[in-house]
Amino acid sequence: MLEKRYLVLEDGSYYEGYRLGSDDLSIGEIVFNTAMTGYQETISDPSYTGQIITFTYPLIGNYGINRDDFESLTPKLNGVVVKEASTHPSNFRHQKTLHETLAQYHIPGISGVDTRSITRKIRNYGVLRAGFTDNKDNIQELVEQLKTAELPRDEVQTVSTKTPYVSTGSDLSVVLLDFGKKQNIVRELNLRGCNVTVVPYDTSAEEILGMSPDGVMLSNGPGDPDEVDVALDMIRGILGKIPFFGICLGHQLFALSQGATSFKMKFGHRGANHPVKDLRTGKIDITSQNHGYSIDCDSLKNTDLEVTHIALNDGTVEGLRHKELPAFSVQYHPEARPGPSDSNYLFDEFIAMMKDFKEKERQINA
């Protein structure tokens, strides 16, 4: 017999469903993701650290979970909400069910709830604190706890690598600042022959330049960019000295380092179907996104940055480029996983930028 579980929101509403995953109940910021596939990559994305994900697609877990498709070593999210969780996956690669995987990583979840209603609530009122209980009598107590709960801060410290390591390639050398990177960023660089050195988020500009890389990338990651101000001096210290490419949180930190400001979005962009327009070409890409903060377009007016991409759904900033220096960034995920590969070409642009910069340096020193 399925055991009851309750998803409780800070506004006092609650949803009755069935126990999924761990009995280690937790609270977090509840968000929604609109991707139809890729639930495993989503669950293992470090950018969701401390959050509770509501999947809008009604059936999750139907092809199971396998270790090879994880985007990080250990999922760090605080909960999963689904309409229906598959108990009999059908895929020759699957190793565990969704329930077994969540239990293994001490992640609570709930199934059998109206995910459309939850999504509409988040859409209309913004992200909310939420938590789980297995006892209906504890709901009001949990509501009061949620109203005053301090959600985790500085999540980047939790998910960043503690020591540098190398993913070997044969050509250009790239230093990747790990703010909570997805593994597919490393894969995409390796596929293009890059030797990737992954370093902690608080590595200094001097340390990076001492490695003599051909380029620097700033990864995605969780939380508020204003809480990662340790990276701003590092960015300013390397700009112009080596080519630069920022993704998601890395994009936001790039903007902040040049004097722009960020703001918390009502419910963010999370899914694999977000249209983005390249203002340089007029081309529209369907992109994978996962962010709850955005750069204030007006704050860019007195900076050396220009907007290169915008979101078609709400007009927010999705891409930036420095007007003088070899540096650019995007708010979305060109590495996908999950999502379409429309924007893979941005890795090729970064490779071309590094080669061009290297050739100019060679000519200057000749």
Swiss-Prot record:
It comes from the Bacteria. Keywords: Amino-acid biosynthesis, Arginine biosynthesis, ATP-binding, Glutamine amidotransferase, Ligase, Nucleotide-binding, Pyrimidine biosynthesis. GO terms for molecular function: ATP binding; carbamoyl-phosphate synthase (glutamine-hydrolyzing) activity; glutaminase activity. Pathway: Amino-acid biosynthesis; L-arginine biosynthesis; carbamoyl phosphate from bicarbonate: step 1/1; Pyrimidine metabolism; UMP biosynthesis via de novo pathway; (S)-dihydroorotate from bicarbonate: step 1/3. It holds the Pfam family GATase. The active site is at C248 (nucleophile), H333, E335. Residues 1-171 are annotated as: CPSase. L-glutamine binds at S47, G221, G223, L249, Q252, N290, G292, Y293. Belongs to the CarA family. Composed of two chains; the small (or glutamine) chain promotes the hydrolysis of glutamine to ammonia, which is used by the large (or ammonia) chain to synthesize carbamoyl phosphate. Tetramer of heterodimers (alpha,beta)4. This is Carbamoyl phosphate synthase small chain. The gene is carA.
